[in-house]
Amino acid sequence: MIRVGNGFDVHQLVEGRPCIIGGVEIPFAKGLKGHSDADVLLHAVSDALLGAAALGDIGKHFPDTDERFKDADSRVLLRHVVALLKAKHYNIVNIDATIIAEAPKMAPHIARMVQHIAEDCDILADCVNVKATTSEKMGFVGRGEGIAAQAVCLIQKYQI
């Protein structure tokens, strides 16, 4: 059985927080606001994977009302999601993700983001694609108020 998942996340940019995207701390004057480390890319990827396996979303598994997830490393959360998929006998076929941001520039960091996602998902880097775009100065992203990310994944059930 082959299944597709789609994930989306958005976080506000604020002063006094690190800007962590795809598990990479990006030098920038602002960071993403959230209960965890607010890694918008890994949250979108996690939601896509959970959705593909019909396991709900990250809010269900890592609620922002639970202090255990305060400032949590989203790479740890992603690895937990992958363990849930493996428990249901799913392999990840591929992940394709898009970061939507006016700033900071993502291009210098994308290779490391891909590597982190591949490592955390236990798949080859060739199976992960991350790209970035802007919103052409429109909306909250265009005004530099936040960053969004979306992800799609393909998973496949394997025989045991």
UniProtKB/Swiss-Prot annotation:
Q: Which CDD domains match?
A: MECDP_synthase
Alphabetized Pfam families for the sequence: YgbB
Under Enzyme Commission nomenclature, its number is 4.6.1.12
Q: In which pathway does it act?
A: Isoprenoid biosynthesis; isopentenyl diphosphate biosynthesis via DXP pathway; isopentenyl diphosphate from 1-deoxy-D-xylulose 5-phosphate: step 4/6
Sites marked Transition state stabilizer? H35, T134
Task: Name the catalysed reactions.
Answer: 4-CDP-2-C-methyl-D-erythritol 2-phosphate = 2-C-methyl-D-erythritol 2,4-cyclic diphosphate + CMP
Q: Which GO terms describe its molecular function?
A: 2-C-methyl-D-erythritol 2,4-cyclodiphosphate synthase activity; metal ion binding
- Keyword terms: Isoprene biosynthesis, Lyase, Metal-binding
Which PANTHER family would you find in this protein's record?
2-C-METHYL-D-ERYTHRITOL 2,4-CYCLODIPHOSPHATE SYNTHASE, CHLOROPLASTIC
- Protein name, entry field: 2-C-methyl-D-erythritol 2,4-cyclodiphosphate synthase
Q: What is the organism field in this record?
A: Methylobacillus flagellatus (strain ATCC 51484 / DSM 6875 / VKM B-1610 / KT)
Q: Which gene encodes it?
A: ispF
